[in-house]
Amino acid sequence: VQALLRPLFITSWLIDDFLADQQFFGARRMLLSSASSKTAYGTAFQLAQREGIEVIGLTSPGNVAFCESLGCYHRVVTYDALDQIDGATPSVYIDFAGSVGLRQRIHAHFTGLAYSCSVGASHVGDLGGAGQLPGPRPVMFFAPAQVKKRHADWGAQGLNERLVAAWNQFSAAVSSGPQPWLV
């Protein structure tokens, strides 16, 4: 579990911490593309523990059941069914897919988009710039900047204690329970 997930979980934890530190840019709905990816899963796990935050996983039809089984998405919606989600509700888009086509569709549909966070590129066949987009300009998440900020805020020990506590909770969730994700 450690070797496979811990490096990705650190990024997940930092994304959650960054968004919370920014008060979720005034939004209460988080939209995560590539919801079945390990980093999206870790991020959703963290976000789902926050009071008043709705976590919606966006994925392909073949990954819906898996994403639902993770237990941290309030809803799982396929990429071709974005219109099932109210676009006017203030939302944050956390883009793990990196798909230019999906990013364009997200920005066009979600008129209440408060922040667009680019994290990854799991859809390698559809990468690139999206040109002019409605709504906020996508901003690449840079994990070292959040580490630096939290190191200054909490010190090395405080940062490590928080991260280890979150990791222990996540690692227990993925390796135990009625349907462990990793055994």
Region locations from a protein language model:
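Terminal helix/beta-alpha structural elements that buttress the NAD(P)+-binding lobe
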Residues: 1-183
